[in-house]
Amino acid sequence: MAYPFQLGLQDATSPIMEELMNFHDHTLMIVFLISSLVLYIISLMLTTKLTHTSTMDAQEVETIWTILPAVILILIALPSLRILYMMDEINNPVLTVKTMGHQWYWSYEYTDYEDLCFDSYMIPTSDLKPGELRLLEVDNRVVLPMELPIRMLISSEDVLHSWAVPSLGLKTDAIPGRLNQATVTSNRPGLFYGQCSEICGSNHSFMPIVLEMVPLKHFENWSASMI
């Protein structure tokens, strides 16, 4: 989860988030190099009145600064496309969970079980226990097995919502009348927090998401107790 005054991204919990963080560093390095070069050239232009006459009308220089940006854009686009295709892949999910957005709560249905469904509301600040997080805790957490591919089917009953868990690299729009899907895979157990990321009304800020990733054995025990 995020902390106050945090400068970097949240710790990656899924393979997709690890790829996104690597892509972020890759792109940031390119931006830093370009910015440094531009600032260096500007500083030279401001500190000297001399001009190279050979660069006033140089075909070679114009060719270089036309081709070089194209190469840089390709170096950014190819890793980006690779990650986009990875995010769309869903390989043999062991579990499917249907997520519906409402004003202003989430409902979940484990489609592999007959009667395993519940609503998830934010816990009011006045009802929080010591150590719980304000505006992020819910009365019913989404319990999922770790280290296994899980398919999330996401839609909405009323207006546009967005189901987002940053540490897992997830952000999928919940659109009325349309069913979007995403893959959830966690490398480690724990609680992972998210929120609705699409302005959906007056209580938009009060639609938290809490995923509880547990070992498969614990998930089986939990699902048996819920049915």
From Swiss-Prot:
Q: Which GO terms describe its biological process?
A: ATP synthesis coupled electron transport
What are the protein's UniProt keywords? Copper, Electron transport, Magnesium, Membrane, Metal-binding, Mitochondrion, Mitochondrion inner membrane, Respiratory chain, Translocase, Transmembrane, Transmembrane helix, Transport
What EC number is given for this enzyme? Answer: 7.1.1.9
Task: Please list the reactions this protein catalyses.
Answer: 4 Fe(II)-[cytochrome c] + O2 + 8 H(+)(in) = 4 Fe(III)-[cytochrome c] + 2 H2O + 4 H(+)(out)
Instruction: Show the PROSITE patterns listed in the entry.
Output: COX2, COX2_CUA, COX2_TM
The positions annotated for binding Cu cation A2 are: 196, 198, 200, 204
Q: Where in the cell is it found?
A: Mitochondrion inner membrane
Topological domain spans for side Mitochondrial matrix = 46-59
Subunit and partners? Component of the cytochrome c oxidase (complex IV, CIV), a multisubunit enzyme composed of 14 subunits. The complex is composed of a catalytic core of 3 subunits MT-CO1, MT-CO2 and MT-CO3, encoded in the mitochondrial DNA, and 11 supernumerary subunits COX4I, COX5A, COX5B, COX6A, COX6B, COX6C, COX7A, COX7B, COX7C, COX8 and NDUFA4, which are encoded in the nuclear genome.
Query: What family is this?
Result: Belongs to the cytochrome c oxidase subunit 2 family.
* Entry-linked PANTHER family: CYTOCHROME C OXIDASE SUBUNIT 2, CYTOCHROME C OXIDASE, SUBUNIT II
Supply the name of the protein: Cytochrome c oxidase subunit 2
- Taxonomic source organism: Apodemus sylvaticus (European woodmouse)
